[in-house]
């Protein structure tokens, strides 16, 4: 009963919030200004800055990134003059903010770091945390903080619940939507510095020359915001695109084909990030098709990328069609390969051993592999947590993970994006909080869910305590509510077949994998579980 009351209470609170916004004068969606329709996210609306009274000082050539930083300050800063200064403050894109009665100084070794410092200052202003003197020093825990888009060439998004793909491939490279820059701005504001543009179930055509020219157009938009582009690649591309007879990673012609293709990419996009690969999983081709290991496949691609500084993110989401317990499959396949991957390969592992369930133990690979670079893959889109219909604040899920897996065990962090063409970007206003929380935790995994929710609410809606306090409480309890109704008694896979929305504990599909069916987990005896097969 307690769980039912909590769920009903959350629904009532959502209704109260909506009613309150309407009473405040909110018009229907198709008539709302940007301040109210969700399109501005948690950021100030950008307005013309000509004649702005804010004084920003930068002694040096104003690059596109510095121009963005200056524009953000002139648009929203309400304090003393700001000095931006490139000065060594630590490694990577860290920054320092200091102040006196007459000036605020933002220092960083990099231009991207200065931009992050600007967004941090504006975040503190929105939260009412700017005091004199200021003394803030921040350093990102992970150098790579990457969104993974499961976007397809036809404009659909796998497990997407916020409209169509943000990327209008048919209009690129000639037409650039203003949302591309707005997307880059939102990512930079929370420290996200990379994006994989396409689905891990990748089409070989993404590597065709015409497609790469479209990717270049996006990379050019994102670059001033410190964001690199990456691509998911199909391991069989040498066969399907290059017309070779094989994709064997040890074949000389295959190696030559990949090296030529990588050279073509870097000629167009000098700061290209690298490849994300889903191989030998759910029907996708991979090195195992040719009697090779995951390490041999990943290393071949890594060798092609290394002269340009590129990386390979090789997914560990694999399971054998003949084994009924997929929870152990990634461990069985990757643990024997520990220490065999090249230094520019990162094994990308889902946070849990099953598949983004509302609650899972962490994957054992995170603590077992000692000689391999690893990164965690979270799912920001709510495949198993109510799509974009349910309020489910996911920071507690990720905070739970970082409480078990030491951040220094990881090299990078990835999140499967929840972004689409909906006017509010994420299909549900509160789903924006998960995009925001992912970026903040990827920058600093020691942040609390409470603090992140507080930041997001104050920047997105209002700082009034009468609003922030109850709505934050609702957010902080929402994930546990989803766990209780999606995983009763800790049982997973009680959801509907295929789309994963809503309950279907009676599900029985002839010929389906036993571990995809509810009966495997709910039947009282081995004999009954056998019937699910």
Q: Model features per residue range: what roles?
A:
Residues 521-530:
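Conserved small/polar residues in nucleotide/adenosyl-binding loops
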